[in-house]
Regions:
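Short coil/turn motif common to extracellular beta-sandwich-like domains
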Residues: 284-295, 299
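Surface-exposed, short loops/turns at beta-strand junctions within beta-sandwich domains
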Residues: 329-342
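Alpha-helical scaffold segments that mediate packing/assembly in large oligomeric complexes
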Residues: 91-158, 271-274
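Extracellular recognition modules
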Residues: 342-348
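Extracellular fibronectin type III
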Residues: 352-365
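Short proline/glycine-enriched turn/loop motifs at strand-loop junctions of beta-rich domains
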Residues: 297-304, 311
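Extended, solvent-exposed, turn-rich assembly/linker loops in the middle of proteins
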Residues: 129-197, 319
Length: 368
């Protein structure tokens, strides 16, 4: 029986994870790589970072060649997202629950989990991206804006190997479709269509992304420079609840999933806002373990609020009461943080969100 349960757990877990990966808009291989997936019980993964390439020198047949030394640094990806599935199935014990009922609950779990992973992944991208603010995007200027991003990425030696992507809001996709330079996916092959790519422009594969983050228009990037670790800490299984003391003749579909995201190079990820976003800097606070955020541009008035590691992002014109963040005074409010935390800061005018910023806390931003 134990072997059967273990086999079912492995099968269910693989089914859900496969469905999750199929549902992700910010997909593995398209937006994120999975190069550092490993032990799901670890709280963090140390990732080597090298911005320089291996030195190539002339070889001396008599004396050989001197050994060169690379400059490898390390960055930390926190495995800080811990989500659980615990769905009650009434009137069935674990041994008698129908397969189609389990399949329905697994399908629902995969959908909900994929949405949350997409949300958390996008927040990490925005907090680690290089920001480009544009007053207005139109059918007349959108191509030149994308070409400028392409130029900046090429100057930063981001590979132009067919993997550069654009995540585009629906209203911006409508502008792209009017561009004569836009190549529709039907001309790019079946594999491109299957990946959800609408088309290609200036070397970027464009995928529509229905996101409501205030003023966000699109994200450009390359999967080599953003990574995701995505693992089951406890595999999906059907748990009998007869011994719980509360449930009789019932079971539950349970599982626990841990994951994390990390931007490895800010210049490889570009977030475009129109008409713009807040510009924010961080500095150590006065108290140990704190940071202070100073808004330097992009604001209307001086009313701000923040959230630490938000589970969703602020939409334009969200009311202050609906947002529910903590009040922030620019340059004064001290926020208790740890390295790798993400701070969302919103600018409120007439009681509504008008602009946002996302920023990842570095060790140098925290008072020791």
């Amino acid at each position: 029986m134990a072997t059967t349960n273990h086999t079912s757990q492995e099968r269910y877990s693989k089914l859900v994870l496969a469905k999750v990966r199929a549902l992700l808009v910010l997909a593995d291989g398209f937006v994120f790589n999975n190069d550092y997936e490993g032990d799901p019980t670890a709280d963090a993964v140390r990732i080597p970072v090298r911005d320089d390439e291996v030195t190539v020198s002339d070889y001396d047949r008599a004396n050989g060649i001197s050994v060169s030394h690379g400059s490898t640094t390390y960055t930390t990806m926190l495995i800080d997202k811990d989500k659980a599935v615990n769905e009650l199935i009434d009137k069935f014990d674990a041994a008698s629950v129908p397969d189609n009922l389990v399949a329905d609950r697994l399908d629902s779990a995969a959908y909900s989990l994929a949405r949350q992973i997409d949300t958390d992944g996008a927040t990490t991208l925005l907090a680690g991206a290089t920001v480009k603010n544009v007053e207005q995007l139109t059918a007349q200027n959108i191509y030149s804006v994308i070409v400028d991003i392409r130029t900046d990425m090429s100057k930063a030696n981001i590979p132009d190997d067919g993997k550069r992507y654009l995540l585009v809001m629906p209203e911006i996709m409508a502008l792209l479709l009017q561009c004569p330079e836009f190549i529709r996916s039907t001309a790019l092959g079946d594999a491109t269509v299957e990946n959800g790519v609408v088309g290609k422009i200036a070397g970027f594969k464009a995928k529509e992304w229905n996101d409501s983050t205030a003023n966000l228009s699109m994200i450009a990037g390359h999967p080599k420079f953003a990574t995701r670790a995505n693992e089951w800490a406890v595999g999906v299984h059907v748990q009998d609840l007869s011994g719980s003391g509360n449930y009789i003749g019932a079971c539950a579909v349970q599982g626990r999933h841990v994951y994390g995201h990390k931007v490895l190079r800010s210049i490889a990820i570009r977030a475009v806002y129109a008409p713009g976003s807040l510009t924010v800097t961080l500095a150590p606070g006065a108290a140990s373990g704190t940071t202070k955020a100073t808004v330097t541009a992009g604001n209307t008035g001086t009313t701000y609020a923040y959230k630490l590691n938000p589970s969703s992002r602020a939409a334009f014109d969200t009311t202050s009461s609906a947002y529910g963040g903590t009040s922030l005074t620019s340059g004064t409010t001290e926020i208790a943080v740890r390295e790798g935390d993400i701070i969302e800061i919103v600018n409120l005018s007439s009681g509504k969100v008008k602009a946002v910023a996302y920023i990842t806390v570095k060790a140098s931003d925290i008072k020791a």
